[in-house]
């Protein structure tokens, strides 16, 4: 018998698919037929590490009858979004709330924020001016670049205190030049993720028959994890005192340690994906839970991709740029857990504008960082059947999904 909310597992439901702008009042109105324990205090939104709402929330209810009433609201609408309702329990709720959000047990803020949408050529001085009146620590601005040295349009800023970082969030959607800038909570852990390992967005082309021998040696050096050399300084300008600057690419494309002095050889195993045919190897995300997209419209944006996967909430989106500086029609999308990446595969062959999108899973349960137990998976509505996609058991996926698609023609990003 389930105990009351003052002890035991309580009377808890989980909502999924909430609008990003959802408020406590919206949840109370949606569950107006139910008694919410402690009123507004009984609604607990789940946040991403960037401080954004994840589209999910736990709600503590007053009785088992209230839980049954709430479950009847499954698939009903809130605005233009339909909401999924799952039965949950206090153990799951406490675990998820503890391990989500920028203030979670898995991350430390230390006064960091992340900026997105910076104009091309944005300088650190412009960022300082953007946050005029808020003290930024010395060398506290990081402008990540990709292995080709191109600005990603994002930045990390460390303020002198967490209070100042909270004030900095008030600059969300203000402008630098003609671009409106998004400001999110961040953490030192997230800063590290952009350079730990620094090869996360690197693509290595298989050498052609007329390539110089050095090119082949570089390729073999990575695949065999042999001949690793220290990275040379260059592209990753962290801006934090004591952190060395790395490009992430040595003359031999080899890696020994990251900028925190840790061995990088681990990240080379199980991270090469043969699914795109024989012409390319792609290094996957540091979370280990990535979905590759192919066939994107030429003008597709990050927001289009976030909306495509709604109500799931990707951790990060990287739209690939070719050597000619144009989009390739492909993108890598990182998710926080293996379960979310598997759930995202339900969007395979769905349309974005007038193009259908192919998806390829690159995630393993073994790469999950602590993640959800089977009980948590059930709370998310992920069944064992869903964990098996297109006849391939998720546990058998070894950094390589979609081998059955390798014979298909590549869907480019050009219309």
Curated annotation (Swiss-Prot):
Its BP terms in the Gene Ontology are:
mRNA splicing, via spliceosome; regulation of RNA splicing; RNA processing
Q: Which residues carry this modification: Phosphoserine?
A: 104, 107, 161, 187, 193, 195, 265
The modified positions for N6-acetyllysine read 200, 224
The record's section on PROSITE patterns has: RRM
Modified positions (Phosphothreonine) are: 215
Consequence when changing residue 184 to A: Minimal effect on affinity for RNA oligonucleotide
Q: Which residues carry this modification: N-acetylmethionine?
A: 1-2
Which cellular compartments is it found in? Nucleus, Nucleoplasm
Keywords linked to the UniProt accession: Acetylation, Isopeptide bond, mRNA processing, mRNA splicing, Nucleus, Phosphoprotein, Repeat, Ribonucleoprotein, RNA-binding, Spliceosome, Ubl conjugation
A Pfam family matched by this chain, by name?
Answer: RRM_1
Q: Name one GO molecular function term.
A: single-stranded RNA binding
Complexes and interactors = Identified in the spliceosome C complex. Interacts with AGO1, AGO2, TBP and TXNL4/DIM1.
What does this chain do?
Component of the heterogeneous nuclear ribonucleoprotein (hnRNP) complexes which provide the substrate for the processing events that pre-mRNAs undergo before becoming functional, translatable mRNAs in the cytoplasm. Plays a role in the regulation of alternative splicing events. Binds G-rich sequences in pre-mRNAs and keeps target RNA in an unfolded state.
Give the protein's recorded name: Heterogeneous nuclear ribonucleoprotein F
């Amino acid at each position: 018998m389930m105990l009351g909310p003052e002890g035991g597992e309580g009377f808890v439901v989980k909502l999924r698919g909430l609008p990003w702008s959802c408020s406590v009042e919206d949840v109370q109105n949606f569950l107006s037929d139910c008694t919410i324990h402690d009123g507004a205090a009984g609604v607990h939104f789940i946040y991403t590490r960037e401080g954004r709402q994840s589209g999910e929330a736990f709600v503590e209810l007053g009785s088992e009858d209230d839980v049954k009433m709430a479950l009847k609201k499954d698939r009903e609408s809130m605005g233009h979004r339909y909401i999924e309702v799952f039965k949950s329990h206090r153990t799951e709720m406490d675990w998820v709330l503890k391990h989500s959000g920028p203030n979670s047990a898995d991350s430390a803020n230390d006064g960091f924020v992340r900026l997105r949408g910076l104009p091309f050529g944005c300088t650190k001085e412009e960022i300082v001016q953007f946050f005029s009146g808020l003290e930024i620590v010395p060398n506290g601005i990081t402008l990540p670049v990709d292995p080709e040295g191109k600005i990603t349009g994002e930045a990390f800023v460390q303020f002198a205190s967490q209070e100042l970082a909270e004030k900095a969030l008030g600059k969300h959607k203000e402008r630098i030049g003609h671009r409106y800038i998004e400001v999110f909570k961040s953490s030192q852990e997230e800063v590290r993720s952009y350079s730990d390992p620094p090869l996360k967005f690197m693509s290595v082309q298989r050498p052609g028959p007329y390539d110089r021998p050095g090119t082949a040696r570089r390729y073999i050096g990575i695949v065999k994890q042999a001949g690793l050399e220290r990275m040379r300084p260059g592209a990753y300008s962290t801006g934090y005192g004591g952190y060395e600057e790395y490009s992430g690419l040595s003359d031999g494309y080899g890696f020994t340690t990251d900028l925190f002095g840790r061995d990088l050889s681990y990240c080379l195993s199980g991270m090469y994906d043969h699914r795109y045919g024989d012409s390319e190897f792609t290094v996957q995300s540091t979370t280990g839970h990535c979905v590759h997209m192919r066939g994107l419209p030429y003008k597709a944006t990050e927001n289009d991709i976030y909306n495509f996967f709604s109500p799931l909430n990707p951790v990060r989106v990287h739209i690939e740029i070719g050597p000619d500086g144009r989009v390739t029609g492909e993108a890598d999308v990182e998710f926080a857990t293996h379960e979310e990446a598997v759930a995202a595969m339900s969007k395979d062959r769905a349309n974005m504008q007038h193009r259908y999108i192919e998806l390829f899973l690159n995630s393993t349960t073994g790469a999950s960082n602590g993640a959800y137990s089977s009980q948590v998976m059930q709370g998310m509505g992920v069944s064992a059947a869903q964990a098996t996609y297109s006849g391939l058991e998720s546990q058998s996926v070894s950094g390589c999904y979609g081998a059955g698609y390798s014979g298909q023609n590549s869907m480019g990003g050009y219309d």
